[in-house]
Amino acid sequence: MPETPPTSRTKRIELIVEYAAAFAAMILAGWVLKVVGAAIAARLAYPGDIEWMEGATLVSAMRARDGLALYGAPAGDYIPFIYPPLYAWIVGALAHVFPLGYTLGRSVSAACTMVAGGALVFGARREGASWPLALSTLGLFAACWDDGGTFYDLCRTDALSLALMGWAVVLTPLPSPRATIAGGLLLAVAFTAKQHVALLGLPMLVWVGRTHGRERAKLFVLSSVVPALCFLLVMTLATGGDFLKWLILVPAAHGQTLAR
């Protein structure tokens, strides 16, 4: 027996229930954002390391500001990090205008976290979520602050790489070839902030190929892999090979903790 199509009254009731639930979720998300936002605001100007990498990350930014090498042999006053230089470059450039310190570094990360949140809302809307429901995803994102290591506002490269990676993920699936190019370029730029995002490239490439075809997949490779390889080549030549040592060889020598 065929199902009876829903009446207009039933549709209205379902729509009301859907929007009521979405607004309730948005209100709860607003409360979470208020709590986490207050904690982040209270930490911005804290005059010391909140996490062990912060001070050393600011030293990298100071060296970038002063035009000193970021990668080389370890010394008594400086040991390079195992990450690409984009965050240090950005904070170092801003340090020509603003005082270099914890507030500047954390503000950059907090701003990047907001940009990442924008990608989350954009992606939810693209998948058909209503505005209240899409905005409520920000509450879920904020709720991960503590369990994620509270890196949203730390002087680290994580928030920057997350923002770039997030927009790469939500732009690449769009129908327009320009969106594919933009997503690929953003993924390449994210690689200059944290090399781990390269792991996203393969599943994204497979998805683009299966959804949009081989030619679009080639376009994604040209806009993501090629710029990333050019970056690696330039940095390797500029540092006499030291960049690759810190980016690949040093992390490869570390023990792996799978629980993390």
Write out the residue ranges for each language-model feature:
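Multi-pass, polyprenyl lipid-linked donor-dependent membrane glycosyltransferases
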Residues: 107-112, 136-143, 147-167, 193-200
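Transmembrane-embedded, aromatic-rich helix segments that form part
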Residues: 181-187, 191, 195-210
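Transmembrane-helix motifs of polytopic, lipid-linked glycan transferases
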Residues: 27, 107-128, 167
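Specific aromatic-rich, kink-prone transmembrane helix
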Residues: 160-179, 183-187
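Loop-to-helix entry region of an early transmembrane alpha helix in multi-pass inner-membrane enzymes
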Residues: 85, 89, 97-118
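Extracytosolic helix-loop segments that constitute the early lumenal/periplasmic catalytic or substrate-binding loops
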Residues: 41, 54-79, 86, 244
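Perimembrane helix-loop-helix junctions
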Residues: 12, 199-228, 254
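Transmembrane-helix signature of polytopic, membrane-embedded enzymes
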Residues: 118-144, 162-163, 178-181
